[in-house]
Amino acid sequence: MKFWSRPLTFLIIIIYLIIQQVNSSPPSLSIPEHFLRCLDTQPSDHGSPNSRTAVIPTNSSFSTNLMNGVRNLRFASVSTRKPEVIVAAVTETHIRATISCCKLLNLELRIRSGGHDYEGFSYTSPVPFVILDMYNFNKIDINMKDETVWIQSGASLGQLYYNIASKSKVHAFPAGVCPKVGAGGHFSGGGFGNLMRKYGLSIDHIIDAQIMDANGKVYRNRQAMGEDVFWAIRGGGGGSYGVILAWKIKLVRVPEKVTVFKLERTVREGAVDLVHKWQQVAPVIDRDLFIRLEIKPINRKISKGKTIKVSFIGMFLGLPERLLNITKQSFPELHLTKEDCMVKKWIESSVFWANYPEKAPIELLLKRVSTNEYYWKRTSDFVQAPISKQGLAKIFQTMIDHSPLPRRVWMQWNPWGGKMAEIASDATAFVHRGGNVFMIEHFMNWYRPGDELEEKFLAIARSFKEAMAPFVSKNPREAFFNYRDVDIGITTPGYNATYEGAKVYGDSYFKGNYLRLVKIKARFDRTNFFRSQQGIPVLA
C-alpha cells in the first residue's frame, strides 16, 4: 500500500494542477490582441510600449482612425474588410515593430501616408492586414541656404507648400494641386502638378531619401540603399520596396507674383474648336504657362437637353502683361483678357488650384482630414496625337450619353511638353515623358450607397473609357501609376505574384521600365513582403 501511495498521490497532484491551469487560462486571443502583445515584445523607445500607437476594432477610436484616411466611400462599406490593427507610427521603432509583427503573424502590411490611393490599396486588402499609418510621421525641415527640404512621408503637400511660403516668397516645389495628398505616395508615383511644364515632376527634384526594408534596416541615403533602389522608388511606387521614411527635395524658383485664370466655354461658344487648338498649343507654348482642361456635361440653359462645358484653367509664372502677349501670339482664339487674370503669390495660387473659395486663408492648406461625401472611380489615359474635331465631337456626345445628370462622367486634360519632353523615359521609373501630348484623368462620382448603384456607375465609367480607346495610347494602353485602376488587372493575394501575372498592369504603368523594377524588387525585397494587388512582383 505504501508502495502505490506516493506515485498515486503525485499523479493526482499533477492532474489537479493541469485542471487548474486550464481553468485559469485566459480565452484565446484574437488576431488584433496577438498583434498588440507582439508589438510590446519588440524593442521600444525609452521603455514606452509600442502598442500605445495602435488601435484595434474594439477601441472606440478605431473607426475614426480608419475613416480619417479613407478618401473614397466605395471602400468604407460594411462588406469591405477592415484592418486587424492600425498603427499610427511616431518613430522608426514603431515602424520596425509593425513590420516584425506582420511577418510573425503572417499579416499583410498596408502603408498609408495620405489615403489617396484610387483603389484603396493603402487601407484595404482581400486578406487579413495591418495599416501602418504615417499621418504623424510628418516633420518638414527646410534649409534655405542650399534650397533643400527633408520631408517625412506622412506630411501633406499643403503642409509642404505652407512651410515653404513661410520661409520664402520666391521658392516652390513642383507637385500636385490637392493639398491633402501625402508626400509618401505622391512622390513615389511621380508627382505631377501645374509646374510640370517648367520643372518636370516631383521626382525630378528628389535628391535623396530614407527607406526601411522588410528586415527593419534603415538606409539613410541613396548611397546606402543603392542607386538602383533610389531609381525605383522615384516613379515605381515606393510601397513595393519598403517604407519610405523621408524624402530630400530641391526647391525651385518662382516669381513673387504669378497669374491664374479660369475661362469657361460651351459647345455653342466654340468649345470644340478651342479644344482642338489647345491640343496644338498647350504642349509647345511658353513653358511658364500651364493650361488644364476640365470637360463636363451640363444641362443646357436655353433649350432642353445636355451640352458640354470646357473650363480652361491656367497657371502662369509671371504677370498678366507677358501672359497676354503669349496667348495673343499663340492662342488668340482663347480671347483671354486682363479682367480674366488674377495675380497672386505662389502660395495663394495653391489655394486657388485646391478649389477653395476666393480669398480663403492659406491656413486651409494645413487641413488634412476631409469630409468623405461621395463615391468615385478614377482612371487615366495618355494621348500621343491630337484628336480631330470630328473625334472631339464624338467624345463630347459620348460623354453626354454616359451622363445620367446630375451624375456624370467628366475629364481633366493635362498638357505635357516643356521640361517633360526633355527627360529620358528611363531617367526615373516614371516612363511617360516625351511623345505624349497630354494625360487624361477620367472621373465618375456618385453620392448614394448601394451595391447595385455602384455597379451601375462603375459600368458607365468602364463603358466610357472603352469608348475612348481609339483616341489614346495603344500597345500598351498607358496609365499613370498614381491613378490606380483595378480594371487594368490585378494579382491574386499572397506571395505568388509573378512577373508574367503582373505584366498586364506593369506594362501599362511602366512600359520598358517594368522589367528593371522587377529585378530591383527581387534583390531588395526578395520575399515580396511589401505587396499589394498591383505591386511590383519578384522575378519568377
UniProtKB/Swiss-Prot annotation:
Q: What is its main location?
A: secreted
The entry's comment on post-translational modification says: The FAD cofactor is bound via a bicovalent 6-S-cysteinyl, 8alpha-N1-histidyl FAD linkage.
* Limits of the FAD-binding PCMH-type domain: 79-254
Q: Which GO terms describe its biological process?
A: response to jasmonic acid; response to wounding
Q: Does the keyword Methyltransferase apply?
A: no
Cellular component GO terms held in the UniProt record: extracellular region; plant-type cell wall
What are the recorded GO MF terms, alphabetically? FAD binding; oxidoreductase activity
- Tell me which Gene3D superfamilies the record gives: 3.30.465.10, 3.40.462.20, Uridine Diphospho-n-acetylenolpyruvylglucosamine Reductase, domain 2 (3.30.43.10)
Its signal peptide is: 1-24
Disulfide bond entries: C38-C101
Cross-link (6-(S-cysteinyl)-8alpha-(pros-histidyl)-FAD (His-Cys)), chain numbering: H116-C178
Q: What are its E.C. numbers?
A: 1.1.1.-
Localization terms from the record: Secreted, Cell wall
**Cofactor(s) for this UniProt protein:** FAD
PANTHER family reported in the protein's UniProt record: OS08G0158400 PROTEIN (PTHR32448)
From the Swiss-Prot or TrEMBL record, give the protein name. Berberine bridge enzyme-like 16
Q: Which organism is it from?
A: Arabidopsis thaliana (Mouse-ear cress)
